[in-house]
Swiss-Prot record:
Cofactor note: Binds 1 zinc ion per subunit.
HAMAP family on file: Q_tRNA_Tgt
Reactions listed under catalytic activity: 7-aminomethyl-7-carbaguanine + guanosine(34) in tRNA = 7-aminomethyl-7-carbaguanosine(34) in tRNA + guanine
Record text on subunit structure and interactions: Homodimer. Within each dimer, one monomer is responsible for RNA recognition and catalysis, while the other monomer binds to the replacement base PreQ1.
Protein name: Queuine tRNA-ribosyltransferase
Pathway annotation: tRNA modification; tRNA-queuosine biosynthesis
Annotated positions binding substrate: 93-97, 147, 190, 217
Region: RNA binding, residue numbers: 248-254
One GO molecular-function entry: metal ion binding
Organism encoding this protein: Jannaschia sp. (strain CCS1)
Function of the protein: Catalyzes the base-exchange of a guanine (G) residue with the queuine precursor 7-aminomethyl-7-deazaguanine (PreQ1) at position 34 (anticodon wobble position) in tRNAs with GU(N) anticodons (tRNA-Asp, -Asn, -His and -Tyr). Catalysis occurs through a double-displacement mechanism. The nucleophile active site attacks the C1' of nucleotide 34 to detach the guanine base from the RNA, forming a covalent enzyme-RNA intermediate. The proton acceptor active site deprotonates the incoming PreQ1, allowing a nucleophilic attack on the C1' of the ribose to form the product.
UniProt: Zn(2+) binding residues: 305, 307, 310, 336
EC number(s) given by UniProt: 2.4.2.29
Family named by the database record: Belongs to the queuine tRNA-ribosyltransferase family.
Lineage of origin: Bacteria, Pseudomonadati, Pseudomonadota, Alphaproteobacteria, Rhodobacterales
Length: 376
């Protein structure tokens, strides 16, 4: 990484890795899960509450922040950390995925992507240079290069063309990023599910040189089996002495499978989005708190969980406030889900340090196979 930032690999267990990404704003223990703060907030959570779950780093969305309140406004107000009251590291995505999935009337050229805002219809150009400028204005600690993320399935020619465009954009991103001591720039591997295209992409990224490397273009509709098939080779194509980031993943079993295959970092809106829709994640799997079976249940979501929702509230209460559409429902379930995710990451870090990831994985799947506790 650039000066004052580094990656230290501490232990391995099979392909699973544990270590520390050291940044001027603090250490990021890996494997790490990054809660998503789309619009400079993790929905339904105070920043100090997110930190209390054990999160070392948040993710911010370049596309959303450039449109509202604008990167220039955030910079004038002291940068994203100050703006959202988060003093730990922040990673920002490049905006490419959201442009291709959310924006209206988009046009893709060699220069970048011209699009109209989904908010007010205003016209914008997002290019490698503009993405680097926006992320610098935001002041994020880890910056992602600008790429195109094609939806799967896609034919080979489309994947090949897209990958080559992303590699040209990666080189432009690196040049535009410049020399920024203490800040890191990650490249993004593309190539769909094709091993040779992934290798060609990884080779191009290695030649450019980045502080970390993401496996991009997965979790876009291909299904878990296909994703794991790709992860059986894609992380191995990336440098071993740099962090590896799987973008947009995911469910707990996706995360465990990714770590097993050598991934160090992940992000996903799932734990917070699920919390707002009455879904809780526990070591036994998913709990739908809206179901009538919970209406008279005095037990916690998970008797072994130490989050505020499990320490202080019953399933009956959580069922009631969700059915009554009270704001505290989303707050408590989101806190629980983020706490569960961070506990999962810590358990994996401990297992890797003890060279027992296989044992952890067996226990993880055995717990989930039991299913939720029996109704009263």
């Amino acid at each position: 990484m650039t000066r004052a930032s580094s990656f230290r690999l501490d232990a391995t267990s099979g392909k699973a890795r544990t270590g520390v990404i050291q940044t001027p704003r603090g250490d990021i223990r890996t494997p790490a899960f990054m809660p998503v703060g789309t619009a400079a907030t993790v929905k339904a959570m105070m920043p100090e509450s997110v930190a209390a779950t054990g999160a070392d780093i948040l993710l911010g969305n370049t596309y959303h922040l450039m449109l509202r309140p604008t990167a220039e406004r955030i910079a004038n107000l002291g940068g994203l950390h100050s703006f959202m009251n988060w003093d730990k590291p922040i990673l920002t995505d490049s905006g490419g995925f959201q442009v291709m999935s959310l924006a209206d009337l988009r046009k893709l050229t060699e220069e970048g992507v011209t699009f109209r805002s989904h908010i007010d219809g205003s016209k914008h150009l997002l290019s490698p240079e503009r993405s680097m400028e926006i992320q610098k204005l935001l002041g994020s600690d880890i910056v992602m290069c600008f790429d195109e993320c094609p939806a799967l399935p896609a034919d080979r020619k489309a994947l090949d063309d897209s990958m080559r465009l992303s590699m040209r954009w990666a080189a432009r991103s690196k040049e535009a990023f410049g020399d920024r001591p203490g800040y890191a720039l990650f490249g993004i591997q593309q190539g769909g599910l094709e091993e040779d295209l992934r290798e060609e992409s990884a080779k191009a990224l290695r030649e450019i040189g980045f502080d970390g490397y993401a496996v991009g273009g997965l979790a876009v509709g291909e299904g878990q089996a296909a994703m794991f098939g790709c992860l059986d080779f894609a992380p191995d194509q990336l440098p071993t002495d740099k962090p590896r980031y799987l973008m947009g993943v995911g469910k707990p079993d996706d995360i465990v499978g990714a770590v097993k295959r050598g991934i160090d970092m992940m992000d996903c809106v799932l734990p917070s989005r699920s919390g707002r829709t009455g879904q809780a994640w526990t070591r036994r799997g998913q709990v739908n708190i809206k179901n009538a079976r919970h209406a008279d249940d005095p037990r916690p979501l998970d008797e072994d969980c130490t989050c505020p929702a499990c320490r202080n509230y019953s399933r009956a209460y959580l069922h009631h406030v969700f059915r009554a559409q009270e704001m505290i429902s989303g707050m408590l379930l989101t806190w629980h889900n983020l706490h569960y995710y961070q506990e999962l990451m810590q358990t994996m870090r401990d297992a890797i340090a003890a060279n027992d990831f296989a044992g952890f994985e067996a226990r993880f799947h055995a717990d989930r196979a039991e299913g939720d506790i029996v109704p009263l």
